[in-house]
Every structure is written in structure tokens, then in C-alpha cells.
């Protein structure tokens, strides 16, 4: 009788015992009168030794990735053949029976981590690519993490509730994926961009702690960290402040990193305001694994003779600087030109610089800073071989963002980023609105359901540009991992927000009437957060794209080479739905 086991279950206790393993053939090695098979299942790899003549004839028919059944005797490897890097490296199976369960066609690419197959080929044969250890392990880690999330929240009395996936189209910034209704011709459902309104309705219903591992859909251009369909941990709580949510998420992530990666995070993440993040790092999602911080030098240059700086300051603009210590000699003209190209992307007045040599400014705009030279050297403790970069712009935000991107580029070039570090950060107190120069209207900076901080409520309509919301983001290594807020629970205030963004009563009733009505029935104060599961696992596994941690992702054109979706449907289906396809003018 053979004991059916998995590859990882080979151990000392089974030595000289009969075992049976079902697995795939990873490698075939012929050595004269005997052959080795390296086999693999989900759990581990193992080595099979074939010596019997009738079995060697079967092996002649076996190719890579055949699915086979091996029955044999577990024996110890000779000392010179031990592989201490494998948990099964001390044993091998002496084959007694071999059965081919299923053959494998010629492979489109080798099942190896370093194969050079194209992305489309890997996605077309995703079921083969998933046999690679590195990809398989990422998917398994994702399963472990979501399991931990569920257990963590259920233990804290959260209810896992499912919200609809056919919803009313209420665009939240990106385009909706729409679904035509056969029964209600001319009407459409939308796939949810998030469960935002439904989770707020859940709070109004009295379920004070909700979570969901939610599938969400946004019709937007694909990027390395975006897909048309994605997964997020969505949660909401009644009667809370943002600090309650911070503590919950910090403890949850502490558990995930400890159990999945054996990494002990701090149980209390750093916290900074949006304004500090922009001023110090030039980003609302700063990478804090390295210092290299921005400084505002406007005050020191208020009497500057340099016309560019003078004009900017006369227009109440900003001058941001970045000081790189003891590295001036590494910045060639070509390298500085590359940094200037980044500044141009933000339509700044340019990137300026000067170096410190012999205790004075040298090169770049040194000749325009003679008056301020010694004052700046003293104020910023500048030393020989330092280099100082300047960006000036009439808009504070543009100056910050441009210099923030240059900060990242310099950090990468100088190798300042510790890739083994996980730096979490809460960014809070975001602006409630942004002004859209194209439409000349205010739009929500995050979304339209976030409550303003109390001191801004009375003057909302008068100064929407100054309003700060109870809004917060969770950032990990410069990537926005999650976003949340304390929500509006008052119908009148919600309508005021709608009015500011141009959703007057008729329009807001049409789009959100059902939600406004619900706010009339004893809505509790509540807040929550959504955390991108795909992004979290991408960062935990040090992947370069969320495609690496999604089981069956789309390609960069939001298409699936695996099943050739999206695809056309028949004229009969279109007719049934009452849809006519406009001719393609291209």
C-alpha cells in the first residue's frame, strides 16, 4: 500500500516506506543506466530516481510538464548528492511505478523565473506561467494575507457583507463600465468603482462594523499599478474618529507582515498633514525610506536680483530647493539636463542649480546669487561639494510636485532607497476641493462624501479653496495604498457639497436621490477606508506590477489574451438589448 503524499511531506519517518506523489515534470536528467526526474507540485519539488528497465522505457515517452503519478520507495540521497537548499534535498524516491496522467504539448516558453517570453504570451498561457515558483508564491501569499484580514476583522466583530455589483451609474472620477439591461431597454447598470454609497447605507442600517474583499471596476487607462478590475479591502465603522481607523489598520498590517513575511512593523505609523508632505517631500504620497527633503527658500530670496526669482516672488509664488550633500562632483551636465527635463513636464520656469566650491557658489546661477551667497551658505549649513537645486513657480503646488519628482530621481540615481524597508505613513488633512482650470469649477479632491473639518463648514461656499476635509491616505514606500475619510451624515451638508461641485438639487436628486433620502433616517457619524489588496501584495512581494499578483490579469490595453476578451457579440444579442453599434470612423 502506497501512502499518498505531497512533495513537501517527504521526511525521515518515511524512509524505506512506499509513497505515491502526483506532480508535474520539471526536469529530466539521463545518466547512462539510470534517469532522474525533478518533479513539482504546489508545495515543493522532489527528485525521483529511475533504475528499472521497464520504467526507463516509460520515461523515454515523458516530456517536460507532463502530469504523472509516481509510486516508489523513499530513500536517502548519497551524501554527495544532498541539496541542502531544498527541504526535500536529503531524499529521493526510488520509482517502482510510473503513470502518465496527462501529456503536455510543446511549451510556448520555459517554466522558469528567468524566461524571456513576452507579456502577452505569458498572459495567454497564464495557467503555465503560474507554475513558476516566484509567481505561484506571490498568489499563495495573497491568499494568506486575505485570510488573515478576514480572521482579524471577524474577531473584532466586523460583519463581512456583500454589496451589489450591478449598480446605478454615478461616476466618481473615472469612467464606469456599463451593462445594458435587456428588460429595461435603453437603461444601463454600472459595475461599481467602489462600494462607497452602499457601505454608507450599511452604516445607516445599523451594522456598525462592515468589511468586504470587494471587486471594483474602473474604465481607465492601464498603468503598472492599475487594472480595469481590481480588489480592495473595503471597511466602514460607525461612531468613530480617524484615530480609531488608524489604530485598527496599523494592528491589522502588523499581523499580516508578521505572519506572511516574518517582518515586525512598528505598531504606530508616522503621521503628517498633506501640507507638510507637499512642503517636505513634494508629494502627497511621499517615499520616506530616505531623507533628502525639500525646503522653501522664498523668504531668503525676497530681495533677489535674479529676475526669474524676483517675478515669482512678486506674484506670491514659491521657490523650492533640494540640497544634496557632498555629491556635487557626481552631477555632470548631462545628468543635470535629465533633471531639467523632469522640471519641464510640470511647466515650471526651469530647474536651476549651483554648487559649493571653496566655500562659495560656483556654476549654474551662482553669478545671480552674489548678494545672498554667504547668507544662504550659513542658513542651510552648506559645505564644499554640496549642490543646491531650485525650482520656482507661481503655484506652490507645482513647485512642490516638480521638485518632489526630482527628489525621487536623485534618490534612485544615488542609490539612497533601501529596497528592503517598509515605511508606512498616514497623510491626513487633505483639501476638500480642487479647482479645475478647464471647467472653471471645483471638483472633489478625493470624493464628494467626505466631511469638512468643523472650522470650515460655516464658510464652505465662500472659501471652498481653503476647506480641509477629514480625509486620510495610507502610503507605503511612496505608493498610495489606501484612502479613506470620515463621511458626511447630514443631508443638508451633503447637498451643500453637491452644490459647490455643480450638482444642483435636480442633478443630485437624479444621481444620488436614494442616498440623500437615506440620510433623513437617523444616519450615524461614520468613517472608513479602502486598501488596495493588489498594491499591498505587489509591495510585499517586491513586484514591479500588480499584474504579478493577480491570478488572471489584463494586459496593458485592458484586454485578456487568455480568453480574447473583450469580444464582439452577435447581432441577435445586440438586437435583444436594443443596441446599435456606431460605425468605426477610424
Curated annotation (Swiss-Prot):
<feature type="binding site">
    <location>
        <position position="227"/>
    </location>
    <ligand>
        <name>ATP</name>
    </ligand>
</feature>
<dbReference type="GO" id="GO:0005524">
    <property type="term" value="F:ATP binding"/>
</dbReference>
<keyword id="KW-0030">Aminoacyl-tRNA synthetase</keyword>
<dbReference type="GO" id="GO:0005737">
    <property type="term" value="C:cytoplasm"/>
</dbReference>
<keyword id="KW-0648">Protein biosynthesis</keyword>
<dbReference type="Pfam" id="PF02938">
    <property type="entry name" value="GAD"/>
</dbReference>
<dbReference type="Pfam" id="PF01336">
    <property type="entry name" value="tRNA_anti-codon"/>
</dbReference>
<dbReference type="GO" id="GO:0004815">
    <property type="term" value="F:aspartate-tRNA ligase activity"/>
</dbReference>
<dbReference type="InterPro" id="IPR047090">
    <property type="entry name" value="AspRS_core"/>
</dbReference>
<dbReference type="InterPro" id="IPR004365">
    <property type="entry name" value="NA-bd_OB_tRNA"/>
</dbReference>
<dbReference type="InterPro" id="IPR004524">
    <property type="entry name" value="Asp-tRNA-ligase_1"/>
</dbReference>
<dbReference type="GO" id="GO:0050560">
    <property type="term" value="F:aspartate-tRNA(Asn) ligase activity"/>
</dbReference>
<dbReference type="InterPro" id="IPR006195">
    <property type="entry name" value="aa-tRNA-synth_II"/>
</dbReference>
<dbReference type="InterPro" id="IPR002312">
    <property type="entry name" value="Asp/Asn-tRNA-synth_IIb"/>
</dbReference>
<comment type="subunit">
    <text>Homodimer.</text>
</comment>
<feature type="binding site">
    <location>
        <position position="218"/>
    </location>
    <ligand>
        <name>L-aspartate</name>
    </ligand>
</feature>
<feature type="binding site">
    <location>
        <position position="487"/>
    </location>
    <ligand>
        <name>L-aspartate</name>
    </ligand>
</feature>
<feature type="binding site">
    <location>
        <position position="172"/>
    </location>
    <ligand>
        <name>L-aspartate</name>
    </ligand>
</feature>
<dbReference type="InterPro" id="IPR004364">
    <property type="entry name" value="Aa-tRNA-synt_II"/>
</dbReference>
<feature type="binding site">
    <location>
        <position position="446"/>
    </location>
    <ligand>
        <name>L-aspartate</name>
    </ligand>
</feature>
<feature type="binding site">
    <location>
        <position position="480"/>
    </location>
    <ligand>
        <name>ATP</name>
    </ligand>
</feature>
<protein>
    <recommendedName>
        <fullName>Aspartate--tRNA(Asp/Asn) ligase</fullName>
        <ecNumber>6.1.1.23</ecNumber>
    </recommendedName>
</protein>
<keyword id="KW-0547">Nucleotide-binding</keyword>
<dbReference type="Pfam" id="PF00152">
    <property type="entry name" value="tRNA-synt_2"/>
</dbReference>
<feature type="binding site">
    <location>
        <begin position="218"/>
        <end position="220"/>
    </location>
    <ligand>
        <name>ATP</name>
    </ligand>
</feature>
<dbReference type="GO" id="GO:0006422">
    <property type="term" value="P:aspartyl-tRNA aminoacylation"/>
</dbReference>
<comment type="similarity">
    <text>Belongs to the class-II aminoacyl-tRNA synthetase family. Type 1 subfamily.</text>
</comment>
<keyword id="KW-0436">Ligase</keyword>
<dbReference type="InterPro" id="IPR047089">
    <property type="entry name" value="Asp-tRNA-ligase_1_N"/>
</dbReference>
<dbReference type="InterPro" id="IPR004115">
    <property type="entry name" value="GAD-like_sf"/>
</dbReference>
<dbReference type="InterPro" id="IPR045864">
    <property type="entry name" value="aa-tRNA-synth_II/BPL/LPL"/>
</dbReference>
<comment type="function">
    <text>Aspartyl-tRNA synthetase with relaxed tRNA specificity since it is able to aspartylate not only its cognate tRNA(Asp) but also tRNA(Asn). Reaction proceeds in two steps: L-aspartate is first activated by ATP to form Asp-AMP and then transferred to the acceptor end of tRNA(Asp/Asn).</text>
</comment>
<feature type="site" description="Important for tRNA non-discrimination">
    <location>
        <position position="31"/>
    </location>
</feature>
<feature type="region of interest" description="Aspartate">
    <location>
        <begin position="196"/>
        <end position="199"/>
    </location>
</feature>
<dbReference type="InterPro" id="IPR012340">
    <property type="entry name" value="NA-bd_OB-fold"/>
</dbReference>
<keyword id="KW-0963">Cytoplasm</keyword>
<keyword id="KW-0067">ATP-binding</keyword>
<dbReference type="GO" id="GO:0003676">
    <property type="term" value="F:nucleic acid binding"/>
</dbReference>
<feature type="binding site">
    <location>
        <begin position="532"/>
        <end position="535"/>
    </location>
    <ligand>
        <name>ATP</name>
    </ligand>
</feature>
<dbReference type="InterPro" id="IPR029351">
    <property type="entry name" value="GAD_dom"/>
</dbReference>
Amino acid at each position: 500500500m502506497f501512502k499518498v503524499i505531497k512533495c513537501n511531506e517527504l521526511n525521515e519517518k518515511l524512509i524505506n516506506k512506499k509513497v505515491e506523489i502526483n506532480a508535474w515534470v520539471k526536469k529530466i536528467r539521463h545518466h547512462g543506466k539510470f534517469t532522474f526526474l525533478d518533479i513539482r507540485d504546489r508545495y515543493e519539488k522532489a527528485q525521483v530516481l529511475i533504475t528499472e528497465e521497464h520504467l526507463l522505457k516509460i520515461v523515454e515517452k515523458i516530456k517536460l510538464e507532463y502530469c504523472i503519478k509516481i509510486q516508489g520507495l523513499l530513500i536517502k540521497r548519497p551524501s554527495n548528492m544532498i541539496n541542502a537548499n531544498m527541504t526535500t534535498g536529503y531524499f529521493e524516491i526510488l520509482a517502482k511505478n510510473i503513470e502518465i496522467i496527462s501529456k503536455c504539448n510543446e511549451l510556448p516558453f520555459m517554466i522558469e523565473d528567468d524566461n524571456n517570453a513576452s507579456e502577452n504570451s505569458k498572459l495567454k498561457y497564464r495557467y503555465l506561467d503560474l507554475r513558476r515558483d516566484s509567481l505561484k508564491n506571490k498568489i499563495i501569499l495573497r491568499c494568506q494575507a486575505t485570510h488573515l484580514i478576514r480572521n482579524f476583522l471577524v474577531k473584532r466583530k466586523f460583519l463581512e457583507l456583500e454589496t451589489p455589483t450591478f449598480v446605478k451609474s454615478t461616476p466618481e472620477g473615472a469612467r464606469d463600465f456599463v451593462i445594458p439591461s435587456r428588460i429595461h431597454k435603453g437603461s444601463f447598470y454600472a459595475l461599481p468603482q467602489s462600494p462607497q454609497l452602499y457601505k454608507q447605507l450599511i452604516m445607516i442600517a445599523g451594522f456598525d462594523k462592515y468589511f468586504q474583499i470587494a471587486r471594483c471596476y474602473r474604465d481607465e487607462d492601464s498603468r503598472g499599478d492599475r487594472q480595469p478590475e481590481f480588489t480592495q479591502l473595503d471597511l466602514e465603522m460607525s461612531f468613530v474618529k480617524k484615530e480609531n481607523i488608524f489604530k485598527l489598520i496599523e494592528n491589522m498590517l502588523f499581523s499580516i507582515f508578521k505572519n506572511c513575511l516574518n517582518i515586525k512593523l512598528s505598531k504606530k505609523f508616522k503621521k503628517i498633514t498633506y501640507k507638510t508632505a507637499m512642503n517636505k517631500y513634494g508629494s502627497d504620497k511621499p517615499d520616506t525610506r530616505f531623507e533628502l527633503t525639500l525646503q522653501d527658500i522664498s523668504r531668503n530670496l525676497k530681495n533677489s536680483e535674479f529676475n526669474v526669482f524676483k517675478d515669482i516672488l512678486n506674484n506670491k509664488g514659491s521657490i523650492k530647493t533640494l540640497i544634496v550633500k557632498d555629491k556635487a562632483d557626481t552631477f555632470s551636465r548631462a545628468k543635470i539636463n535629465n533633471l531639467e527635463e523632469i522640471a519641464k513636464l510640470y511647466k515650471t520656469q526651469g530647474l536651476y542649480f549651483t554648487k559649493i566650491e571653496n566655500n562659495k557658489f560656483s556654476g549654474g546661477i551662482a553669478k545671480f546669487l552674489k548678494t545672498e551667497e554667504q547668507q544662504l551658505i550659513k542658513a542651510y549649513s552648506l559645505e564644499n561639494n554640496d549642490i543646491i537645486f531650485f525650482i520656482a513657480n507661481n503655484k506652490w503646488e507645482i513647485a512642490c510636485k516638480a521638485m518632489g519628482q526630482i527628489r525621487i530621481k536623485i534618490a534612485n540615481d544615488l542609490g539612497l532607497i533601501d529596497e528592503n524597508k517598509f515605511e508606512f505613513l498616514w497623510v491626513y488633512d487633505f483639501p476638500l476641493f480642487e479647482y479645475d482650470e478647464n471647467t472653471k469649477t471645483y471638483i472633489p479632491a478625493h470624493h464628494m462624501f467626505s466631511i469638512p473639518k468643523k472650522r470650515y463648514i460655516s464658510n464652505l461656499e465662500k472659501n471652498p479653496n481653503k476647506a480641509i476635509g477629514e480625509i486620510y491616505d495610507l502610503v507605503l514606500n511612496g505608493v498610495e495604498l489606501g484612502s479613506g475619510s470620515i463621511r458626511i451624515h447630514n443631508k443638508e451638508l451633503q447637498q451643500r457639497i453637491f452644490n459647490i461641485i455643480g450638482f444642483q438639487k435636480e442633478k443630485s436628486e437624479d444621481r444620488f436621490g436614494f442616498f440623500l433620502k437615506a440620510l433623513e433616517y437617523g444616519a450615524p457619524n461614520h468613517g472608513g477606508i479602502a486598501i488596495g489588496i493588489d498594491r499591498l501584495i505587489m509591495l510585499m512581494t517586491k513586484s514591479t506590477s500588480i499584474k504579478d499578483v493577480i491570478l488572471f490579469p489584463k494586459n496593458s490595453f485592458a484586454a485578456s489574451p487568455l480568453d480574447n476578451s473583450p469580444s464582439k457579440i452577435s447581432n441577435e444579442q445586440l438586437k435583444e438589448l436594443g443596441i446599435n453599434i456606431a460605425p468605426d470612423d477610424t
